[in-house]
């Protein structure tokens, strides 16, 4: 199996951390909070999640500089398990496309 795609929209809820790897690749990490109403088995359901997101590479560096807490985004990429310092695994979205959502203000 090779299918692994996720598209998620939401609001950045934790301040982005920006760093550059020893090989010179820029990385931006943040947490995206998603809230929506979905239909499941014919019933409306309120859904909510927080997804850690990593976006890497110089091609995305300009757009990641404009990301702050409260920024609304749609991201698309693949999911991967990362082991934290506490030894627990967490799901992380590795974004390959990122789009700022105009809030209309």
UniProtKB/Swiss-Prot annotation:
Swiss-Prot/TrEMBL keywords? DNA replication, DNA-binding, Primosome
- Cellular component GO terms, alphabetical: primosome complex
Q: Which NCBIfam families match?
A: PriB_gamma
- What is an example of a GO molecular function annotated in this UniProt entry? single-stranded DNA binding
Family statement: Belongs to the PriB family.
* Chain's role: Involved in the restart of stalled replication forks, which reloads the replicative helicase on sites other than the origin of replication; the PriA-PriB pathway is the major replication restart pathway. During primosome assembly it facilitates complex formation between PriA and DnaT on DNA; stabilizes PriA on DNA. Stimulates the DNA unwinding activity of PriA helicase.
Q: Which GO terms describe its biological process?
A: DNA replication, synthesis of primer
Q: How the protein assembles, per its UniProt entry?
A: Homodimer. Interacts with PriA and DnaT. Component of the replication restart primosome. Primosome assembly occurs via a 'hand-off' mechanism. PriA binds to replication forks, subsequently PriB then DnaT bind; DnaT then displaces ssDNA to generate the helicase loading substrate.
Q: Which domain of life is it from?
A: Bacteria
| Pfam families reported in the protein's UniProt record | SSB_1
- Residue ranges of domain SSB in the record: 1-102
Task: State what protein this is by name.
Answer: Replication restart protein PriB
């Amino acid at each position: 199996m090779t299918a692994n795609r996720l598209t998620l929209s939401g609001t950045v809820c934790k301040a982005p951390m920006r760093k550059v790897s020893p090989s010179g690749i820029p990385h931006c990490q943040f947490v995206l909070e998603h809230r929506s109403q979905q239909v499941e088995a014919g019933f409306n359901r309120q859904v909510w999640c927080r997804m850690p997101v990593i976006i890497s590479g110089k091609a995305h560096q300009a757009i990641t500089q404009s990301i702050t807490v409260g920024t609304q985004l749609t991201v698309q990429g693949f999911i991967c398990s990362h082991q934290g310092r506490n030894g627990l695994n967490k799901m992380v979205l590795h974004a390959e496309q990122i789009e700022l959502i105009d809030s209309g203000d």
